[in-house]
Swiss-Prot record:
Lineage top rank: taxon: Bacteria
Assembly and oligomerization: Alpha(8)-beta(8). The alpha component is a flavoprotein, the beta component is a hemoprotein.
Pathway terms, separated by semicolons: Sulfur metabolism; hydrogen sulfide biosynthesis; hydrogen sulfide from sulfite (NADPH route): step 1/1
Organism: Vibrio cholerae serotype O1 (strain ATCC 39541 / Classical Ogawa 395 / O395)
Principal EC category: oxidoreductase
Gene Ontology biological-process entries: cysteine biosynthetic process; hydrogen sulfide biosynthetic process; sulfate assimilation
Catalytic activity: hydrogen sulfide + 3 NADP(+) + 3 H2O = sulfite + 3 NADPH + 4 H(+)
GO cellular component: cytosol
GO MF terms, alphabetically ordered: flavin adenine dinucleotide binding; FMN binding; sulfite reductase (NADPH) activity
PANTHER family with a match to the protein in the record: NADPH OXIDOREDUCTASE A, NITRIC OXIDE SYNTHASE-RELATED
Protein name: Sulfite reductase [NADPH] flavoprotein alpha-component
Residues given in the record as FAD binding sites: 337, 371, 401-404, 419-421, 425, 434-437, 614
Cofactor binding remark: Binds 1 FAD per subunit.
Keyword annotations from UniProtKB, A to Z: Amino-acid biosynthesis, Cysteine biosynthesis, Electron transport, FAD, Flavoprotein, FMN, NADP, Oxidoreductase, Transport
Length: 614
């Protein structure tokens, strides 16, 4: 992930912007600082600047005042950037905008939405929101309170505010960029003026986001001038996990240590326990974080795709300014597995397909079709010959897959573990495989290189209080982060109670990490384990049913301050568990439905109800 930094130069003297300040340091301190600075490279300076800022915030130190005479010219205003992010993409875009604003001499500040008070918008002149969308159109957890405030009657009128919104989402889903659309509408309703039109960016958002930021900055240069970039600092707290310089854009080349199937021979699922060696990388992570994995497309799929549109793969194409063969571009740079509605609609027009054109006019049918097909299936709907440029114009750029980390570093050291469900099904008699999951499970041999990075997730974290009880709901591969939670709690010697609810199809074939859970039960680290195997009896039973079965105990734990976690499928499981939790609160707390919903909402705001759903 990118870190917000205050840019400093290297060399034998202090950076000019720093030297220009009325220094609060004595001569000895200045000399010591200068000697240290000259020994650091640009990357180290960037880290140190963020670290010292975090210290200054935690110790409530003030930033030195800069008078008009100490800067080139006084600022006519400042830019406030607010990010609403679930997995880190929106945060990364917001940090990039901050750096670019600083470089342009614009005074700017960056806020995590959870740290920003909505009423303070009345004091702002220029605000940019960068917002991702969680689940089925929900605001990310860090933006729930701000989202609720801005749509309430408590929100202030904002006639003096100019704003812009960049939404991130996936057009495959019905509520594409819904959180960005919400913030845009809220601000308009409050009388704010759009600085720039909202951008609804898809999965491959990088190029569109870069152009949008350029547009924003070209406007802001005329309206916000003169502030020294060194005064622009992020106000969100420095993470407890030191951020490495490896990121989505600059991943670390690790190696695959283990890929072990952990479902039974007769299971209908192929779930893998993956271990990746991070030795000498310096990468650190916390329970709740995710690992980003860059993958390569299967040669067989690339060849089939080329054959379907009459291309050889030897054609030369330009990718990011580099000349590549089409085969190489499809292998390393383009998404050729999952279909999406935009692909279907564009191919329908290009191929003049009546069938696909008719389908594209029905949004619900289009989404359903795109969900169950892959790119190759769409291209085979019509026999057409495409040019290399036409083919690439249909495709999204390849993006890494994020997997919930299934290990604690206090337990495994310089390794990271994943629990990966291999996507595998048949379509019209042919096998279809997921891109990243099949890469990890089938393409890579042990010892092979794999490019990875850590995506920190501050919205899914263990409580700082080791005495707090935990209730963890993780069916299927949703069990992954709770393996890391339990490992961490054991290594910390945490006294808090731990309760795990796991579900899958059958006890004998699909009980993931069964031996480990039994060990933790025996040792007392895990206080309770409830399981729901849906196909082991005539009537299907799921984790939400187990919650309702134990409603009295769930309520008791909540009253004792328990934290409630859910990981796994967003489309059905997470919704059903959410409704079951409300029912538990309603029945056991003696509340009506509306009051129970408010209680659960307050749990989320207090970060005692956290979800990692997908």
């Amino acid at each position: 992930m990118n870190r917000e930094v205050v840019t400093m130069s290297t060399g034998n003297t202090l950076p000019p912007a720093l030297a220009a300040l009325a220094s609060p340091l004595n001569d000895a301190q200045l000399n010591q600082l200068q000697q240290t600075v000259t020994q650091l490279n640009a990357q180290q300076l960037a880290w140190v600047s963020g670290y010292f800022w975090g210290l200054s915030q935690s110790n409530a130190l003030s930033v030195p005042h800069i008078s008009a005479g100490q800067t080139a010219s006084a600022a006519s205003g400042k830019l406030t950037i607010i990010f609403a992010s679930q997995t880190g993409n929106a945060k990364g875009v917001a940090q990039a905008l901050l750096k670019e604003a600083q470089a342009a001499g614009i005074q700017a500040q960056l806020f995590d939405a959870s740290d920003y008070k909505g009423k303070d918008l009345a004091k702002e002149t220029h605000v940019i929101f960068v917002a991702s969308t969680n689940g089925e159109g929900e605001a990310p957890d860090n933006a729930l309170a701000l989202h609720e405030f801005l749509k309430s009657k408590k929100a202030p009128k904002l006639p003096n505010l100019k704003y812009g919104v960049l939404g991130l989402g996936d057009s495959s889903y019905q509520f594409f960029c819904q959180t960005g659309k919400d913030f845009d509408q809220f601000l308009e309703n409050l009388g704010a003026q759009r600085l720039v039109e909202r951008l609804d960016a898809d999965v491959d958002y990088q190029a569109a986001a870069t152009e949008w930021r350029k547009q924003v900055l070209s406007i802001l240069k005329d309206e916000l001038t003169g502030a020294a970039a060194v005064t622009s600092v992020a106000t969100f707290a420095v993470s407890q996990t030191a951020e490495s310089h490896y990121s989505k854009e600059q991943p670390y080349t690790a190696s695959l240590s283990t890929s072990q199937k952990i479902t039974g021979r007769d299971s209908g699922k192929d779930v893998r326990h993956i271990e990746i060696d991070l030795a000498d990388s310096g990468i650190t992570y916390q329970p709740g974080d995710a690992l980003g994995v860059w993958y390569e497309n299967r040669p067989q799929l690339v060849n089939a795709l080329l054959d379907s549109v009459g291309l050889s793969g030897h054609e030369e194409v330009q990718v990011d300014g580099e000349t590549l063969s089409l085969h190489s571009a499809l292998t390393h740079h383009y998404e050729i597995t999952a279909a999406n509605p935009q692909l279907v609609a564009q191919f329908a027009e290009l191929a003049q397909s009546e069938k696909l054109t008719s389908l594209a006019q029905d949004k619900e049918a289009l989404r359903e079709y795109a969900t169950r097909t892959q790119v190759i299936d769409v291209l085979r709907e019509e026999k057409v010959t495409l040019s290399a440029i036409q083919l690439l114009s249909l495709l999204r750029r390849l993006t890494p897959r994020l997997y919930s980390i299934a290990s604690s570093q206090s337990e495994v050291g310089e390794e990271v573990h994943l629990t990966v469900g291999v996507v595998e099904y048949e379509y019209k008699g042919e096998q279809r495989l997921g891109g990243a999951s099949s890469f990890l499970a089938h393409q890579l041999e042990e010892g092979a290189p794999v490019k990875v990075f850590v995506e920190h997730n501050n919205n899914f974290k263990l409580p700082s209080d080791d005495n707090a009880p935990l209730i963890m709901v993780g069916p299927g591969t949703g069990i992954a982060p709770f393996r890391s939670f339990i490992q961490e709690r054991e290594n910390r010697g945490a006294a808090g109670k731990n309760w795990l609810l796991f579900g899958d199809r059958t006890f004998t074939q699909d009980f993931l990490y069964q031996v480990e859970w039994q060990k933790y039960l025996k040792s007392g680290v895990l206080n309770r384990l409830d399981v729901a195997f849906s196909r082991d009896q005539h009537e299907k039973v799921y984790v939400q049913h187990r919650l309702l079965d134990q409603a009295e105990l769930v309520w008791q734990w909540l009253q004792e301050g328990a934290y409630f976690y859910v990981c796994g499928d967003a489309s059905r499981m997470a919704k059903d568990v959410h409704q079951a939790l409300i029912t538990v609160v309603e029945q056991q707390g003696g509340l009506n439905r509306e009051q129970a919903e408010e209680y659960v909402s307050e749990l989320r705001k207090a970060k005692r109800y956290q979800r990692d759903v997908y």
